[in-house]
Amino acid sequence: MTIRPAERHDIPAIVRLLKLSLGEELIPKSEDYWRWKHIDNPFGVSPVLLAFENETLIGVRAFMRWKWQMGQNVYETVRAVDTATHPDHQGKGIFKKLTLMLLEQCKKEGVNFVFNTPNQSSKPGYLKMGWQVAGKLPVSIKFEKPASIILHAAGLKTNSQTRIDVSNSLTYFLDHPNLDGLIAKDRANQTFISTQPSVEFLRWRYKQVKVVEYFAAGFETNNLLRALVLYRIKPGKVGKELRVTDIFMESATYRREATTLITDSVKLHNAEYMTVSTNHQWIFSGILSLNALKIGPVVTIRDVMNGPMEKLQNFREWSPSLGDLELF
């Protein structure tokens, strides 16, 4: 078996192996999606290792680059994402070998920590390699239509196929001349570890992605963008979920306006319920009543080099949004 870093000409073979090993799952696998995720990412090209038996690709392991910040501190991190082993070569330790080799490479590059949201079948393998459970991402929920939710759950109602065309608002707000200023002011007020965003990042994350459609709602005064909410609509077994993926505010002064953007969007899309990271719950305090539920993904972490691990545990000083952790 030979192991080497992936190159761009390997993408078709990588995608074929992912489909062979994992199937399509929820997110369709394609060369375009791989390029968006691992090459076009503003945080940098993903480190990827490939394993070959003769000329046959039998293993792939990819980490995705991410930057978190807290005040003036910036943490260089990676997210353990795509991995696949050829069905004829499973049980040979390929997943573990590639993962540990990639961790060593990341350590040499000065990466601080690695994080991911493993499923139940892969989590034990990560824990054996030194990962720790940080906890379940706390998610808050607002039930808008309890009766409709019950009907959906009982199979007596199905999701409407009517599409609300408000996609132009996403382009408008992501091209807003004041967006950069809003991002800077929002992050200046942050007291937790949060993603280091930029206009380029938001356009990549929410506009250039092809597998999910996102929407935006903003509040402006005097041609200045004061608050921005990014979200998506996710049909499910109990009705339509409006998932708030990111919120940016010039200051806490605009909490009420940000809340109104969300409640108006829920009505616009006729959603049964709304979800948001509990880390954002302070925005709605005294304005909107939310229920905190343990329905978020389990997040695991591993120190690579001088990571702020105590701050990450139980999200003590770590504030991922739903947009940070979903989809990837």
Question: How would you label these PLM feature ranges?
Answer:
Residues 112-162, 221, 230-328:
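Active-site/acyl-donor-binding loops of N-acyltransferases
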Residues 12-14, 18-48, 52-53, 107-109, ...:
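Amide-forming acyltransferase catalytic core, primarily the GNAT-like/NAT-type
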Residues 74-87, 239-250:
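Conserved acetyl-CoA binding element of GNAT-fold acetyltransferases
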Residues 63-68, 83-85, 118-121, 279:
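An acidic- and aromatic-residue-enriched active-site/binding cleft used to recognize and process polar
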Residues 85, 90-104, 253-264:
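Conserved acetyl-CoA-binding loop-helix of GNAT-fold acetyltransferases
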Residues 49, 59-61, 78, 83, ...:
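Conserved GNAT-family N-acetyltransferase fold
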Residues 53-58, 62-71, 231-237:
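Acetyl-CoA-dependent GNAT
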Residues 1-3:
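Extreme N-terminal starter segment of soluble prokaryotic enzymes
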